[in-house]
Amino acid sequence: MEKTKYNFKQISNSRNVIMGIATILILIFHSQTLYLHKIFNSNIIQNLITFFRDTGNVGVDIFLILSGLGLYYSFSKDSNIKNFYKKRLLRILPATIIVAIFTTVLMEGSGFGYFLRRLTLLTLFTGEDVDFWYFSLIIILYLLYPLFHKVIKKFDSKGIIMLIVPILIINHCIRVFDITLYKNIEIAITRIPVFIAGIYLGKKSSEGFKIDKKILIPILLLLSIMILLLYIGIFKKCAFVIRYVYFFISIPIVILLSFIIKNNDNIVERFLIDIGKYSMEIYLIYEYLVKNCVNLFVYHDKYNLAYYIAVIILTFILAHVLKQISNNISSKLVKNK
């Protein structure tokens, strides 16, 4: 009988592998000038490759789901809010500050004032920053997490509605009454619901909640329908809806991937786990490099493939260095307290 059941614990067990897949999707999405589609003469194949690249930002939504899931486990083990904030901020701030100093002050010459605005999340609301919005969002979600956790833990599935509906209403009000502000922050605030869904999945995972595997069929069907609708461009006339469409794409992807992944410790899974370990550092570094290193390359092939391979290798090297430095800083800060 157990063989006919899908256990939500599989999401937690597969979390690191899925994180690696999400990281690769983000790399693909930020490869806007990688012209591999030009290899093919078929317009259909070109369009499919372009569509796959452009929908790679679903990796961000997957990040948020897995983040919410992981936080549920972490907070359930230690619900001391002070300890929670300390752990979370020590995880994200050292690497973020290092990259922010390097890119903002040293490379861009934007000055210390802009660096402070970036660090205090103000650039998210003013529309000045298109690179650090994710980390601004994550810090905000960390601050709100204890409330989210309490609601989901107490009200279960009803808690999702209690949290998401007010957020959707607030988002809509901002869009109606201050469209400029909405355009600045929609990339972040429209993704809060998927983070909340991740918390709920964390609860179900920690409980070992099981469903009949047959339910995975309509989940796959939902995913297929949403991807098809996105591909044919049905949401182009209402662009603000697209962010929410990824809600209904990312959750099925996470569930189906956790079902497929067998955790057999094979070479592919180990590779994805290694990438997933550096997901934050890669996210911080890659987009900046891919935008700003192009002038360092004298020769470009017509597909820009050599350029992207070089940038990816450099990203992985710098991500490893950044993680080591930020971990050392975090360790010293913990010892000094």
Which sequence ranges carry the predicted segments?
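Membrane-cytosol interface segments of multi-pass membrane proteins
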Residues: 1-170, 213-217, 266-268, 274-278, ...
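Alpha-helical transmembrane segments and terminal signal-anchor/GPI-anchor hydrophobic tails
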Residues: 4-5, 174, 183-196, 203-281, ...
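Membrane-interface micro-motifs in multi-pass membrane enzymes
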Residues: 14, 57-61, 127-139, 183-199, ...
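Histidine-centered divalent metal-coordination motifs
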Residues: 30, 283-286
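Transmembrane helix-loop junctions and nearby membrane-interface residues
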Residues: 30-37, 104-108, 150, 175-179, ...
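Short glycine/serine- and small hydrophobic-enriched flexible loop segments
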Residues: 70-73, 149, 199, 203, ...
